[in-house]
């Protein structure tokens, strides 16, 4: 949509400066292939209070973010905005391809819809926030900043990012609901097996 292109052009013309560039570069690098979320999730596994959170995050990132990256994007095949507009293209090429700072330049064959950075950020933020409610505000701030980098550097349309936010929150919530039900079922199964063993011993 033309309004999305105009919005991205406006961001470049009005918000870009060396300080913001440095900060946004770092954030968008951390979101590459969701590696930072996997790293934190694996750390969660080592602590009893966060183990369940870690398992839920890893499962969601693999299944949902992975599906978006390897399947969903190729269903829609939406071309990235900087490939549709000469002004955006010239900016990205000058900024990234000839510099490749932090290796954040999207591959030539990658598609735009929906934003994987945004989806992963809000999946992770939603799951962690539900299990650890006190972390809600910082989680959502970080996820929002991560998502904004995809607009600050015109790798995605605004609607790509909005879709990533909504999908991340929805499936993050669904992941927790499913995980809680599975946990209850597993606990019941374990208790049932223990009871059967006790009954067999008593006989």
Model segments located where?
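Small-polar-interrupted transmembrane alpha-helices in polytopic inner-membrane proteins
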Residues: 59-75, 136-150
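Interfacial segments of alpha-helical transmembrane regions
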Residues: 40-71
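N-terminal transmembrane-helix/juxtamembrane module of multi-pass inner/ER membrane proteins
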Residues: 1-38, 69-105, 194-203
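Membrane-helix interface segments
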Residues: 19, 49-54, 82, 131-138
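Hydrophobic, aromatic-rich transmembrane alpha-helices
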Residues: 37-48, 121-129
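Membrane-water interface at transmembrane helix exits
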Residues: 44, 68, 72-77, 129, ...
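Membrane-embedded catalytic cores of phosphoryl/pyrophosphoryl-handling enzymes
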Residues: 96-203
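Alpha-helical transmembrane segments of integral membrane proteins
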Residues: 24, 52-60, 135-138, 159-163
């Amino acid at each position: 949509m033309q309004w999305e292109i105009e919005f991205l052009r406006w961001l470049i013309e009005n918000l870009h400066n060396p300080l913001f560039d440095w900060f946004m570069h770092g954030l968008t690098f951390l979101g590459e292939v969701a590696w930072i979320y996997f790293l934190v999730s694996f750390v969660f596994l080592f602590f009893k209070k966060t183990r369940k959170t870690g398992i839920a995050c890893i499962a969601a990132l693999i299944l949902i973010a992975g599906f978006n990256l390897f399947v969903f994007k190729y269903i829609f095949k939406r071309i990235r905005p900087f490939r549709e507009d000469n002004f955006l293209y010239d900016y990205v090429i000058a900024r990234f391809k000839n510099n490749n700072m932090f290796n954040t330049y999207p591959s030539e064959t990658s598609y735009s819809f929906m934003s994987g950075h945004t989806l992963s950020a809000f999946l992770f933020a939603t799951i962690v926030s539900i299990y650890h409610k006190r972390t809600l505000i910082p989680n959502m701030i970080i996820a929002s900043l991560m998502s904004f980098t995809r607009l600050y550097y015109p790798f995605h349309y605004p609607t790509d990012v909005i879709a990533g936010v909504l999908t991340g929150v929805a499936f993050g919530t669904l992941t927790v609901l499913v995980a809680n039900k599975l946990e209850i079922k597993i606990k019941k199964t374990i208790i049932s097996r223990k009871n059967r063993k006790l009954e067999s011993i008593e006989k």
